Amino acid sequence: MVQKESQAALEERESERNANPASVSGASLEPSAAPAPGEDNPSGAGAAAGTGAAGGARRFLCGVVEGFYGRPWVMEQRKELFRRLQKWELNTYLYAPKDDYKHRMFWREMYSVEEAEQLMTLISAAREYEIEFIYAISPGLDITFSNPKEVSTLKRKLDQVSQFGCRSFALLFDDIDHNMCAADKEVFSSFAHAQVSITNEIYQYLGEPETFLFCPTEYCGTFCYPSVSQSPYLRTVGEKLLPGIEVLWTGPKVVSKEIPVESIEEVSKIIKRAPVIWDNIHANDYDQKRLFLGPYKGRSTELIPRLKGVLTNPNCEFEANYVAIHTLATWYKSNMNGVRKDVVMTDSEDSTVSIQIKLENEGSDEDIETDVLYSPQMALKLALTEWLQEFGVPHQYSSRQVAHSGAKTSVVDGTPLVAAPSLNATTVVTTVYQEPIMSQGAALSGEPSALTKEEEKKQPDEEPMDMVVEKQEESEHKSDNQILTEIVEAKMAEELKPMDTDKESIAESKSPEMSMQEDCINDIAPMQTDEQANKEQFVPGPNEKPLYAAEPVTLEDLQLLADLFYLPYEHGPKGAQMLREFQWLRANSSVVSVNCKGKDSEKIEEWRSRAAKFEEMCALVMGMFTRLSNCANRTILYDMYSYVWDIKSIMSMVKSFVQWLGCRSHSSAQFLIGDQEPWAFRGGLAGEFQRLLPIDGANDLFFQPPPLTPTSKVYTIRPYFPKDEASVYKICREMYDDGVGLPFQSQPDLIGDKLVGGLLSLSLDYCFVLEDEDGICGYALGTVDVTPFIKKCKISWIPFMQEKYTKPNGDKELSEAEKIMLSFHEEQEVLPETFLANFPSLIKMDIHKKVTDPSVAKSMMACLLSSLKANGSRGAFCEVRPDDKRILEFYSKLGCFEIAKMEGFPKDVVILGRSL
């Protein structure tokens, strides 16, 4: 148990630690100039107890900083992190979660007894795994630097943490206002002087610990004014900050694509020490739709001897960081001794390493790596090969609440409602799902801001609980490195195979999860007990349906997954290939139009061949989604499911759109205008595909939150063919009966003829159907311009219906079926031209009641509206009976709104519209 110290005890500790304590007012607060790197420290600062930096060479800090905006990791995740860091020969963990309110927003508050016990346990676990635990605090939001009470409060807080067993600390002043309060302006000549003063004082008060980090407000090249080499702020830091204190730096930008050696030499010169890199290359807290599973890249191993350390600030989702941390470890170990490139002995460009790199990059979109010590593609394959083993290990949180990505904390008046403290893992946060991608007008201005944008990252639906089932490692005579090396060498011995193009068979999995109670929003697979395991398993008979057997995740699945969620500034090779193919198919779709003049058979064949290959690539994404959804390791699934769900949904739409392009009869020049260059907008690969669809601004249709319980169910949306007519009529009849309870047994086609027959016969170009493994279960029909469509109906469809259905006698009271028959013999009302100018397209859509996934309807509507807008439509409308509450609600959820009554509107229907 830890007790708070009294003010008297604190003052006594201060007097003991500081033989000559600095005054808290006047110029005496500004420290003397720090010696240049390599010079002796005349005051002896930093050499206390023989552990200061000046007392000898300090080890290279390499590991992880938990420094993102969003829900912090829980204690058991951090313990698992320590285990992995030790296994991969990394050595450092920096505790700096932005949304632990006692770390940043309410930094003055002391930790409670329960929180203290958890922190002590965590620090002890780090020591057990030989990981250096660095505790960071961020007082810069509201501290008054010249107030002695504020300084004492900060000391008291760090004193408490030091009593937990922590020996390494960091003061962070990132993402704060540069302006000082009036009281500080009277004492300090600049903001930098104020920060350096308190940092030096705290550093000396703590006994000049061996590891003490300082994060400046100008922590990257783009934040330095007027430049890195001429920044007065950095110059003050370099001259005044004591030499035993290390400086954190993110590189040229907040999220740096590359960190050149020259840039590090430039900043090292002005801050008079080698920096510690806070690397945001895998941080995803600035974009709710992105996940980064690509390798550590854009940092030459030549940097290692020029740095004091590298700490990666990775994805918010803990389990998604396997590749990020593993490849960082590979990068670090490739030049662990800090050997400069000019002394690395290589025989020629045909060395073994070079040959392996060339093999890995053959046929890819990436340039051949020039770093002879480290290949990102080799490192990625190493990481994925080892990660694959984790997917087959049953592992999940043992408590009821489970981490599930896909939501973010609520925001009121622009202020995030942050998760209260991370140390207490039972906090429940009110959440809403992620925002959809913005349209073309909302282009990202400037660079991603992993540290500056205080916006909640997409959060789990529920707080992860305290306990993780520990994975058991097999005790083998061989070391982990030996086993991994053998696996990778065996993989490398195989020839690089082209992408598998076999279409995946999609089957609905039998969910291993138990049914949820309605008042609980958790999603957890039940753990199998010994009693359950001992029960005799059911064995189906020869004529019974065989048991469902889930296919395991493959290395190819993980390679595809990494390519789809690669790095901030680039997509992986397969992802980039899919994007290019869709762009080409979209731009050249006119060659397969029925109305295309002067057809070129070779171009048509090329288009159809490339379209078929693109559909096969989409099928690979669906197969990957199915296998990931069925994997044994639910912990990994819960962290990544929303992202995989998102890419699966958009690829389903894109595939359907390509199929529509291949069978339509109209061409459209309008559709080919406005291509956007890749990498220009937010949202990752899914965002790129969304912006290539005609209705890219229909954010509500692309906003498809995943189900609370993960499912591997996949639906297919495809163009309608005449052979589908009976199935569409059946759905139309069953859903109409369900809505009003009026069977049409004597005239089974009547309701279909009335609602959808004309569209199916005269507007094939704009008709889609929904399929699952049992067949067609939905339809989405439309016509781009209702005026000529009505004329065609009067010429061909209506006469056919009049012949098929005899006009009933109007003298008697008519049944519902007879009223429909009579409508074929009556003159149809024509909608006003003023209305049709804005809503020229007619749509009809419905889905069978057995389909419970709400995202399916959005995808179907997106496909239908894309086809209409691609051919010039400005808006669409539908006609609904006023008493059909189900279908009214159905269309309303799809973004349709009721059009105000105007002269010429039919009296017995409600007209809903949607602008395009």
Swiss-Prot record:
GO terms for cellular component: cytosol; nucleus. Detected in spleen (at protein level). Ubiquitous. Expressed at highest levels in the brain and spleen. The keyword Disulfide bond does not apply. It catalyses: 3-O-(N-acetyl-beta-D-glucosaminyl)-L-seryl-[protein] + H2O = N-acetyl-D-glucosamine + L-seryl-[protein]; 3-O-(N-acetyl-beta-D-glucosaminyl)-L-threonyl-[protein] + H2O = L-threonyl-[protein] + N-acetyl-D-glucosamine. GO terms for biological process: dATP metabolic process; glycoprotein metabolic process; N-acetylglucosamine metabolic process; negative regulation of cardiac muscle adaptation; negative regulation of protein glycosylation; positive regulation of apoptotic process; positive regulation of calcium ion transport; positive regulation of calcium ion transport into cytosol. A protein binds at G67, K98, D174, Y219, W278, D279, N280, D285, N313. GO terms for molecular function: [protein]-3-O-(N-acetyl-D-glucosaminyl)-L-serine/L-threonine O-N-acetyl-alpha-D-glucosaminase activity; beta-N-acetylglucosaminidase activity; histone acetyltransferase activity; identical protein binding. Residues 1-50, 440-480 are annotated as: Disordered. Proteolytically cleaved by caspase-3 during apoptosis. The fragments interact with each other; cleavage does not decrease enzyme activity. InterPro entries: Acyl_CoA_acyltransferase, Glycoside_hydrolase_SF, Glycosyl_Hydrolase_84, O-GlcNAcase_cat. Its EC number is 3.2.1.169. Residues 60-336 form the GH84 domain. Keywords: Cytoplasm, Glycosidase, Hydrolase, Nucleus, Phosphoprotein. It is found in: Nucleus; Cytoplasm. It comes from the Eukaryota. The modification Phosphoserine is found at S364. The active site is at D175 (proton donor). Optimum pH is 6.4. Activity decreases sharply at pH below 5.0. PROSITE patterns: GH84. Belongs to the glycosyl hydrolase 84 family. This is Protein O-GlcNAcase. It comes from Rattus norvegicus (Rat).
